[in-house]
Amino acid sequence: MISVEHVSKRYLTRQGWRTVLHDISFKMEKGEKIGILGRNGAGKSTLIRLISGVEPPTTGEIKRTMSISWPLAFSGAFQGSLTGMDNLRFICRIYNVDIDYVKNFTEEFSELGQYLYEPVKRYSSGMKARLAFALSLAVEFDCYLIDEVIAVGDSRFADKCKYELFEKRKDRSIILVSHSHSAMKQYCDNAMVLEKGHMYQFEDMDKAYEYYNSLP
């Protein structure tokens, strides 16, 4: 289970303190799939980072009783001076997983070839996303966080990502940030709308989208 309890997040900017999330609360059970809708700047990516543990909330608490992925295709944690393979080994040590399995899976899934042995700072954004997506799937989690990344690469690679995530791991929990109504209806059980840092929850996907589309 993931329990988000009265979570707020604020950052210090040149104009002073800016609150990005206001008193967010919800619970997610094992196997549940939740969609998050919101305009740019609504706080979606911030919420994903907090749930993953990349950042702590300013106030409130997030309780986790299941393993949670980092945001899929999030490459910000890579050390640019290290090769893709060195980053892979580092992640394997952190999560205590078999290096040979992760290496073989990543080589086959990412299709990066010899670029895996090049420094990550030489990668294009798409190559970094492929590596991050492959590593996210090579390390098994109870819950996967997806922040608008299913369109990584060409359509064939995107289809491969969808199969690995939504078919082979259909028993896992998913939090999906997307603007796509069809993706939400296909992959999620219910939806939440973030508006200016405030959360609105809907059990009916169409009602969530109706509210989302009514926003200015």
From Swiss-Prot:
Record has Membrane as a keyword: yes
Reaction(s) catalysed by this chain's protein: ATP + H2O + capsular polysaccharide-[capsular polysaccharide-binding protein]Side 1 = ADP + phosphate + capsular polysaccharideSide 2 + [capsular polysaccharide-binding protein]Side 1
EC number in record: 7.6.2.12
Membrane topology summary: Peripheral membrane protein
InterPro entries: AAA+_ATPase (IPR003593), ABC_transporter-like_ATP-bd (IPR003439), ABC_transporter-like_CS (IPR017871), ABC_transpr_TagH-like (IPR015860), Bact_Polysacc_Export_ATP-bd (IPR050683), P-loop_NTPase (IPR027417)
Domain ABC transporter per the UniProt entry, residue ranges: 2-215
PANTHER family linked: TEICHOIC ACIDS EXPORT ATP-BINDING PROTEIN TAGH (PTHR46743:SF2)
Protein name as catalogued: Capsule polysaccharide export ATP-binding protein CtrD
UniProt source species: Neisseria meningitidis serogroup A / serotype 4A (strain DSM 15465 / Z2491)
Taxonomic lineage from the root: Bacteria, Pseudomonadati, Pseudomonadota, Betaproteobacteria, Neisseriales
